């Protein structure tokens, strides 16, 4: 996938609107002035006519551009089968190589977002500079681009967009310049009260140029009267409901915020030179040689500046509800998430499956890569050899273009190749982390049988998923989830395996012990800790840039033009 550098995700608050750049391939970062033009406060302006929001040089929003890239993965069930974590965030304070360390840390979080990346830094003259682009981290950034991001403070973001829409989207971090200072933000999560907040803001004069829930935060900061400046961030976050682990950068501070329920992970570490690092997972700390110190606690705001690290607390303080799927699927096995080893959790899930749902078999295999550790646990407990029966191609991304309906079934074969020598004539247990729609599972069973497997027994290292997620995970609507429509026996018949078993929900909670009350199980139970009162904010359509890049849009006292 070719990377497309972009500055169009950035929001500037200069009084005079900037025109859309005519050079979409400009590699220079956009610089946000420390002291932008004086502009009126949020209470001193009257609504602008609708016609002012667009001009001959600046298209109206939202854009609707016919883009051939909408064909990419649009109907690819093979890549829709898993729930998708949509973001990973990084923040670094106090290291002269902040942008390069951020780049490396984003590499470690690449599994959390593979379709876009961005970095914002603060230069010595207090200027916020940003480079964002479409593609993998290595495709977006080069040595020359990192040279354009000097400074000892940085935040970064990797993003997964939803399949079925253009993949040329603006990516975070977002940056906004206010008359009282500039701020950048990178967000992992999803706000369940986004629609209401946006409606209230628009009613009072704010104009949005994206449908991203993250933009709401920038508008709330714009209208906040809290002092000092970083307290505007705290004030804005206290109005949010749902999941958010965010890192903010101002002209002299790094701020990390985690929602009061702690849905999404956020950890803190420190490098040997004293630099403070925040990241979605500890694997990012490991890569840049930062020592893990602790989690950012649910409801905590950590402010880092030249005087050290200060703590604030958001109100109220509900019981934590951390996403259990971080341990089942999203996080890397070498990460410590919510104080627990992801590897150990998955290994135990496999052991539980072997104990509760045994079957006579000759070999245990995994659906790579997410099912490997659970399969190792199953094999160890069952006393059966684990072998690599499916080989995953790492060169087929989610951008695979399918020319016609007739060859759609080749999608799984491109991604997974069976090893006939392992499978032929064998009774096979295949372990996967989850079943969402069931489409990929049925194709995997068929692949194994075509390779000569005598029997195919599927073991799923999570309970059945019956409800959609509203807290930052891209899952289908509940009526698309196969476990919400079929019994286990019906699913077994649908995917064509000889037997099927899921991890028991009660046993999962028992394994978590005293911590079981601290996890969110909404996808397994339909019991939502924060009640969703509106439709999901679908990330696939949350940005206005369906194919055009290079736009710089302005906010004036809360208005976005």
Curated annotation (Swiss-Prot):
Per the UniProt entry, the effect of residue 265 to S is:
Low resistance to the bleaching herbicides DAS073 and DAS734
Q: What is its main location?
A: plastid
What is its pathway? Purine metabolism; IMP biosynthesis via de novo pathway; N(1)-(5-phospho-D-ribosyl)glycinamide from 5-phospho-alpha-D-ribose 1-diphosphate: step 1/2
Enzyme class (EC, first level) = transferase
- Indicate yes or no for the key word Translocase: no
Q: Which PANTHER family match?
A: AMIDOPHOSPHORIBOSYLTRANSFERASE
Q: What is this protein called?
A: Amidophosphoribosyltransferase 2, chloroplastic
Gene name in the database record: ASE2
